[in-house]
């Protein structure tokens, strides 16, 4: 059987997928595309001559690919995913599935129509702590989850913000706090298998936020959302918060006890069974030496293996398939709507064709378009 031909769209984040996939039997990483000349030169210094470094999407997508990894701008994944699937190419999306409700529907309908594989390759659920929460919860020993929490705090210096968002219309300057939820709500969803059905959210926007000198247009410190899940439980989750200190934290409170990651060490777990004392331990699923050579402490290596297992057919369904991935995007978008008007929003069942019809044609976006304008405020009282 011929190797699966893989292309990567976006050199900066995309190179995190190169090493592991290039070494995996049955796969040929044959193309990497980036529009920026400096990034293409940096990529060429790392990859072999057998990898074609392209300057345009059209050049890369014409190379007979079996699958493409989208590592381009956060708010542009859906459009390119649809173009790829329409050409018979499977899609791995590195970040949120879609930035608007209309594109959420367009993406799902395209995937259903074409029958292509789709995976949201969020790396946080593969990390040691979240992986142990999923293992313990799905074993059933703690019973049903009643309440859960997730925090993703990632402050940046002004120099880092300028490096990550170098242009006036860069998506990072405008992103609402609820949108970047793969590292928070995404972990709770994969650990429990549950889906959000309702959301109410508030943003953190104090006087100190308003007065902060920053290149970021959205000066909010982040957002907090409450989600009613499909089993009736309530999850509290941040999106991306710029507060200190940097870190991730997750907790599941269940009928039979609580399991959470340690705040000082997200690879360590605290387990409290009902009626018993605290058990603190390092899970068995620690990163290997080889995994630690890759990004995010080893999580990038793990998500690469999951990508290969899914594309090769070893795994039939990824942790975040098209429906779960799009639901995660909708949760963030409806969270912004809640911030803007103070209401609680129902999140449609994306599998239900009648329920999801409400999404059709709603392309309002907080991210600037080609004209430099956005069609949905990125926060309350921002015009």
PLM regions with names:
Residues 1-48:
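N-terminal Rossmann-like dinucleotide-binding module
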Residues 3-5, 144-147, 234:
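Residues that mark the start of a beta-strand
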Residues 12, 117, 124-217, 342:
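Predominantly a Rossmann-like dinucleotide-binding segment in NAD(P)-dependent oxidoreductases
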Residues 17, 49-110:
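Beta-loop-alpha module in the N-terminal Rossmann-like domain of NAD(P)-dependent dehydrogenases
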Residues 28-29, 310-326:
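Glycine- and charged-residue-rich phosphate/anionic-cofactor binding loop of Rossmann-like
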Residues 31, 67, 147:
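Short, Asp-centered acidic motifs that coordinate Mg2+ and/or phosphate
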Residues 93, 118-120, 149, 261:
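Hydrophobic residues in well-ordered beta-strands that form the structural core
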Residues 179-268, 293, 299-318, 332-336, ...:
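Contiguous beta-strand/loop segments that form the cofactor/metal-binding neighborhood of enzyme cores
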């Amino acid at each position: 059987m011929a190797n699966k031909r893989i292309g990567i769209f976006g050199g900066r984040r995309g190179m995190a997928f190169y090493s592991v996939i290039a070494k995996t039997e049955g796969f040929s990483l044959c193309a990497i595309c980036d529009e920026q000349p400096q990034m293409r030169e940096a990529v060429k210094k790392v990859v072999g001559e057998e990898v074609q470094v392209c300057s345009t999407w059209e050049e890369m997508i014409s190379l007979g690919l079996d699958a493409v990894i989208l590592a381009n701008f956060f708010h542009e994944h859906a459009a390119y995913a649809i173009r790829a699937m329409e050409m018979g190419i499977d899609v791995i999306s590195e970040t949120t599935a879609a930035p608007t409700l209309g594109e959420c529907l367009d993406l799902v309908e395209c995937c259903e129509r074409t029958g292509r594989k789709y995976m949201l390759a969020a790396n946080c659920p593969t990390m040691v702590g979240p992986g142990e929460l999923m293992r313990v919860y799905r074993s059933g020993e703690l019973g049903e989850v009643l309440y859960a929490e997730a925090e993703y705090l990632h402050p940046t210096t002004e120099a880092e913000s300028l490096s990550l968002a170098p242009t006036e219309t860069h998506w990072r300057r405008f992103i609402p706090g609820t949108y970047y939820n793969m590292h928070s709500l995404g972990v709770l969803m994969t650990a429990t298998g549950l889906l959000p059905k309702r959301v109410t959210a508030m943003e953190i926007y104090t006087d100190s936020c308003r007065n902060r000198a920053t290149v970021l247009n959205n000066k909010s410190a982040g957002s907090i959302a409450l989600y009613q899940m499909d089993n009736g439980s309530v999850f509290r989750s941040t999106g991306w918060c710029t507060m200190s200190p940097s870190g991730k934290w997750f907790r599941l409170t269940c009928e039979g006890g609580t399991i959470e990651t340690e705040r000082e060490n997200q690879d360590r777990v605290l387990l409290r069974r009902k009626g018993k004392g605290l058990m603190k331990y390092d899970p068995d699923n620690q990163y290997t030496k080889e995994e630690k050579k890759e990004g995010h402490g080893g999580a990038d290596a793990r998500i690469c293996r999951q990508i290969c297992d899914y594309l090769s057919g070893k795994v039939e369904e990824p942790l975040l398939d098209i429906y779960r991935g799009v639901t995660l995007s909708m949760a963030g978008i409806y969270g912004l709507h809640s911030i803007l008007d103070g209401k609680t929003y129902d999140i449609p069942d994306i599998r239900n064709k009648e329920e999801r019809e409400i999404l059709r044609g709603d392309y309002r976006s907080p991210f600037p378009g080609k004209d430099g304008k956005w069609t949905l405020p990125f926060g309350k009282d921002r015009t």
